[in-house]
């Protein structure tokens, strides 16, 4: 009879309802785990200079848009101070991690240049098509549409200049001095970059971007420093690193770039300049008729995964536009998923053991199995409902989040003991508690619980609002656990306890 009264109680029905929803959510959607459990990558990104909160928010939003376009799930972008952003991605493959890094490093400043004149920028890109493979030209292509104004400007510039080179750049080293080896310098002057035009690549980039190119032959660091006056930085391409030290001592910002083992000198130049092309002006484009449909192509076999990834990165960057500041990768941390698998097993075992120990302690304290079992049941229900809600909203469970669940459950057990003690009251001496006394004591117990919960929620809300990283996960699950306890499990336990304890004669 008592169990019938318990099961038909409204608050117990609410508890059962949420339990069913949680079980369904866990079965259909499953839990998503954070970086420290599932493994993945954590990238510390440095902005080129400190920024205000508004600019930092722009960087955060732009990065989120870019990275989400890649199709990678569960990306977390967290500003850290005024010059750093931390990007965390769980359950990521090596290929996806490489794409993420390349996409982050791109500021995304686009220029289209002809004969040293910039005729289009990122603002002129109206639409970006899907990446595809062009078997006719053996290249991965990224088609996009330029504004009418940019197309008309190019048509005027290219009139009668069929065969001339058109260059497209993403993040060129504007206002820099390039100190290059002899082989790099000769390649930059070659017909490969000049095509049938009358300006070398060296001349075009200096006119368009103020990039000075200095061949490193019979030239001293002092002479290079004199040439580089007014440049934002000096970039050494395929040049001995000893020069870098001498220039840094003179106060210059110096970067050193070397050729990869799998690239030739021409690909190295393109990578260093952010150059796509040069593309040859066709006979049709040299007639003066504007065309808004253009494309960036990356010549490679269809089986070249690296080229396809590069094309996808270009597509993402063109779609999302340029970032307000340049970013650089400060640190990359890879976390193995094997550690997380072991941890999940340990947490499961520890959770079951903790539940049994709590039940045993409650039983030893009250000497009543009918008190220990409801306490264990409501604690287990609370965990299940919290996990069910986390599954529904796709919240990443990391170590601090799990710590928050444990904290909430610990608080929950304390509150159930408060309810139990209030209901028992003087029962041991009187062996009878009137209904009015039960209600009064229940009210007193819930007043204590609400006061404690309010304090916890206020404190955790501060952490959730003003802190980043693991503290937010801890605060979120703690608040969620407290709310589940106040509105679902604690009222249900109170009703169960009233029947089993408060009205026992």
Swiss-Prot record:
One Pfam annotation, family name? Answer: SecD_SecF_C
Can you tell me where the transmembrane regions are?
6-26, 346-366, 373-393, 399-419, 446-466, 468-488
Q: Where in the cell is it found?
A: Cell membrane
* Keyword terms: Cell membrane, Membrane, Protein transport, Translocation, Transmembrane, Transmembrane helix, Transport
NCBIfam families per UniProt: PRK08343.1-2
Q: Where is the signal peptide?
A: none
Q: Please give, as recorded in its UniProt entry, the membrane topology of this protein.
A: Multi-pass membrane protein
Q: InterPro entries of this UniProt entry?
A: SecD/SecF_arch_bac, SecD/SecF_CS, SecD_arc, SecD_SecF_C
Q: What does this protein do?
A: Involved in protein export.
Major localisation:
membrane
Q: What family name appears in the similarity comment?
A: Belongs to the SecD/SecF family. SecD subfamily.
Is Transmembrane tagged as a keyword? yes
The root-end lineage is: Archaea, Methanobacteriati, Methanobacteriota, Thermococci, Thermococcales
> What GO cellular component entries does it have?
plasma membrane
Which protein are we looking at?
A: Protein-export membrane protein SecD
Q: Which SUPFAM superfamilies match?
A: Multidrug efflux transporter AcrB transmembrane domain
**Where does the source fall among the domains of life?**
Archaea
One of this protein's GO BP terms?
Answer: protein targeting
Q: How does it assemble?
A: Part of the protein translocation apparatus. Forms a complex with SecF.
